[in-house]
Amino acid sequence: MVTAPEEYKDKSKKVKAMNELLNKISKIGIVPVVVLEDANKAVSVAKALQKGGIDCAEVTFRTAAAEEAIQNIARECPDMLLGAGTVLTTAQVDAAVRAGAQFIVTPGYNPDVVNYCVSKGIPIVPGCMDTNAIEMALAAGLDTVKFFPAEQAGGVKMLKALAGPYVNLHFMPTGGINKDNLAEYLAFKKVVACGGSWMVKKDLIENDDYDGIAQLAQEAVMRMLDFRVVHVGINNSSREEEDGQAKRIEEIFGFAQDKHSASTFASAGIEVCGKRFPGTHGHIAIGTSDCERAMYHLQKKGVLFDEETKKYKNGRLLSIYLKEEIGGFAFHLVEK
């Protein structure tokens, strides 16, 4: 049997570790960019973010407190996915990793820093805002880069233009992103997550307003997931019952019928089913911007899902039912 050389095995392990980390970042969806002048406040900030539903942070090396802050968070919040940002030198890489950082983020493309991280298997997301930097990142074996400064560099429109020639490249835009434009960036499926500091503002940290940080984090998560009622499903035991009910709804409200293989939609908001779908009385479909991401955040709240009900299209999860019924109705997520 032919076995791969050790260097290829080692490289494979590094790539797998990087992919696993980026997959988790993608599920979290938001990477708070934290600037700390006082390392003693680091744990309180991290716990506030976790309380708000974000278990990830990028602590920047813009201050002398960064290394100690990372160390404090890594020790007290082991479930936090912790990165080091604004890393400019290989010495800072060593300091960050020694303190407990799990990934490195740089503002620009520094070949020395990138190659150093790649050689040591340290996940890195380098800043790139043009094709030259992107091609250097690809040559280094990376498939995810930071688009920075996102808004100043042209926003989503520029991001889509950059992504065009690089079909396998993904982005983590940062810079000028806030609660109002977050959804626009995340709607572009080449974006794995967005970085931002709006939920960890300087004044909130200085005033020890950790409840305020938690609230802004929670609001950001809800904006990102964008939950909304899509339709209500009515259970029946036969296609005849389905046809009769759909016809009656059309007679009363004028909602045109849209027939499918197992149900009829009487408008977009009412699904009349010709068989017993999950739910004693029926089901309620909750739309979301990203099913995988929504599952991740809801599972952290203890919500259980029926894995057998998963539906995919082109590799993306489109829908899945919760195990729990509420008021005799099943609930399922649907990606919209």
Locations of the language-model features?
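Conserved N-terminal beta1-alpha1 strand-loop-helix module at the mouth
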Residues: 14-99, 119, 179, 207-222
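Catalytic beta/alpha-barrel core
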Residues: 33-35, 56-63, 80-88, 101-109, ...
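Glycine-rich phosphate-binding active-site loops on the catalytic face of alpha/beta enzymes
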Residues: 107-113, 146-155, 190-212
